Amino acid sequence: MTLTRRIIPCLDIKDGRVVKGTNFLGLRDAGDPVELACRYNEQGADEVVFLDITASRENRGMIIDVIQRAADELFLPLTVGGGIRTLDDVQKTLRAGADKVSINTSAVQNPALISEAAQAFGTQCVVVAIDVKRRTSPEPGKTMIPLPDQSSCWYEVVTHGGSQPTGIDAIAWAKEAENRGAGEILLTSMETDGTKEGFDIPITSAISESVGIPVIASGGVGTFDHFYEGFVYGKADAALAASVFHYGEMTIADVKDYLSKKGIAIRPHTQ
């Protein structure tokens, strides 16, 4: 797909504040998403994702304020996800200054939202986030994928932050999302998320090979080499990470230098 691979930090935001801790030195306010996003911008991020995990609809206005401030200060694409349930939500988010919206549970519950958003605002604005879990028992119509230990499994789409099974095959859903107008897939494996043991390569490569739109790998980064594996073996077009960047374990500039030396085409980091 894309010629250059992208590195994308993700910020979880609740009531307008970043909820995962950071240890960046020199930040006036480690809880301010715009300040953090600007720091990532300086480090050479290709995009930034804001994931709004605000529980109540009443506080949704706070993310709009954050988006507006970020759009004024950032010079890189901004994707916003979380709580986007209707076409009106999509419109408000884009009007506030987001370049793309990420829809997850709402897309599974109402697949027409993908088509409606793509038709209204363009496929380039629509990212369908897919959370998956491994299932080892074969079922009719499910795509079994070989695993490194010689076993195999199929991957089920899960919603509501990974808590709700759907019975939907991940590869079939990715294809449907593309057919309905998704411009990108943001794939997170619940098997690897938070483990720092690397991306879930089997499903990342399977979906990357099954669709013609970019796939963003998410969940499990712990080392520089995990980014490399996601691109080379997972065939992902972009890699998303959170904690390794937030806690200062590595910088985006360092990741890009490493990948460049390994022959991966990336957008050069410029101060």
Swiss-Prot record:
Principal location listed in the UniProt entry: cytoplasm
Keyword Zinc (UniProt): no
EC number: 4.3.2.10
Keywords, sorted A to Z: Amino-acid biosynthesis, Cytoplasm, Histidine biosynthesis, Lyase
Gene Ontology terms: cellular component: cytoplasm
Catalytic activity: 5-[(5-phospho-1-deoxy-D-ribulos-1-ylimino)methylamino]-1-(5-phospho-beta-D-ribosyl)imidazole-4-carboxamide + L-glutamine = D-erythro-1-(imidazol-4-yl)glycerol 3-phosphate + 5-amino-1-(5-phospho-beta-D-ribosyl)imidazole-4-carboxamide + L-glutamate + H(+)
Cited Gene3D superfamilies: Aldolase class I
Molecular function (Gene Ontology), one example: imidazoleglycerol-phosphate synthase activity
Active site: 12, 131
Protein localization: Cytoplasm
GO BP terms in the entry: L-histidine biosynthetic process
Annotated InterPro entries: Aldolase_TIM, His_biosynth, HisF, IGPS_HisA/HisF, RibuloseP-bd_barrel
Pathway(s) the chain acts in: Amino-acid biosynthesis; L-histidine biosynthesis; L-histidine from 5-phospho-alpha-D-ribose 1-diphosphate: step 5/9
Cited function: IGPS catalyzes the conversion of PRFAR and glutamine to IGP, AICAR and glutamate. The HisF subunit catalyzes the cyclization activity that produces IGP and AICAR from PRFAR using the ammonia provided by the HisH subunit.
Sequence similarity: Belongs to the HisA/HisF family.
PANTHER family: IMIDAZOLE GLYCEROL PHOSPHATE SYNTHASE HISHF (PTHR21235:SF2), IMIDAZOLE GLYCEROL PHOSPHATE SYNTHASE SUBUNIT HISF/H IGP SYNTHASE SUBUNIT HISF/H (PTHR21235)
Assembly: Heterodimer of HisH and HisF.
Full protein name: Imidazole glycerol phosphate synthase subunit HisF
Protein's organism: Methanospirillum hungatei JF-1 (strain ATCC 27890 / DSM 864 / NBRC 100397 / JF-1)
Gene: hisF
